[in-house]
Design a protein with these regions (language model features):
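Acidic/His-rich active-site region of diverse nucleotide-sugar glycosyltransferases
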Residues: 1-56, 62, 71
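Glycine-rich phosphate/pyrophosphate-binding loop
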Residues: 16-30, 163-191
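A cytosolic small-molecule/anion-sensing beta-strand core signal
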Residues: 34, 66, 79
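An amphipathic alpha-helix/helix-turn recognition signal
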Residues: 60-63, 101
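Short active-site alpha-helical segment characteristic of glycosyltransferases
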Residues: 63-67, 83
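Active-site-adjacent helix/loop segment of glycosyltransferases
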Residues: 71, 75-164, 176-179
């Protein structure tokens, strides 16, 4: 995740995928692993209370990995693993519901787990997401733009409950080592 909670993967940033030239042939500690390709010990899964059922789909594995690290465990990337996964198979890449869940669940996850002042982060995030919603209006249509608006409405309805969860959460881990994936994407830096 970057500082603003936008996820990225090794070798992929948004829809830009690097050619595999072996640049990621290593074992490395990572912040999160895709739910389609990670293993977790049952004991650790139980300690974290597993996936948060409020998420249903999208970001639930990042939330789980974050909570796992807050308990002192590590998440590792093992390059020799082979995974075959149909991306966006549940809802489809162009689904406004996917857009809604991506933005809503990101807000849920950050509110629950972010180590710093969540309200300062949310203040900046609203502006960034507004710009994204305008971009989506132009590139994907009004349904995707409105999906972001609906994500915020749902989030604000749950905010009081999320703050209660946040106050009970052990927030040890700083979630980012990259300030903004957008800057990296523009600069074409390798993640």
């Amino acid at each position: 995740l970057d500082k603003f909670g936008y996820p990225y993967c090794r070798g992929r940033l948004y829809n830009s995928i690097e050619i595999d030239n072996g640049q990621y042939d290593d074992v490395k500690e990572i912040f999160w692993a895709c739910g389609a390709c990670f293993f977790i010990r049952k004991k650790v899964f139980d300690l974290t209370n597993g996936f948060d059922n409020k998420f249903w789909a999208h970001m639930e594995e990042i939330d789980l990995c974050w909570r796992t690290q807050n308990l002192g465990y590590k998440i590792k990337y093992i390059y020799k693993s082979k995974v075959y996964h149909q991306n966006a198979g549940t809802l489809g890449q162009n689904s406004p519901k996917k857009t809604y869940l991506d933005f809503r669940n990101q807000l849920y996850m950050l509110t629950k787990n972010y180590k710093g002042n969540i309200f300062i982060l949310l203040f900046f995030k609203v502006f960034v997401d507004f710009i994204i919603s305008v971009f989506f209006l132009i590139t994907r249509g009004i349904k995707h733009s409105l999906a972001i608006f609906h994500a915020y409405l749902s989030f604000y309805k749950q905010l009081k409950h999320l703050i209660i969860i946040r106050n009970r959460t052990n927030r040890k881990v700083i979630h980012y080592n990259t300030f903004s994936i957008v800057f990296n994407f523009i600069g074409l830096k390798r993640l």
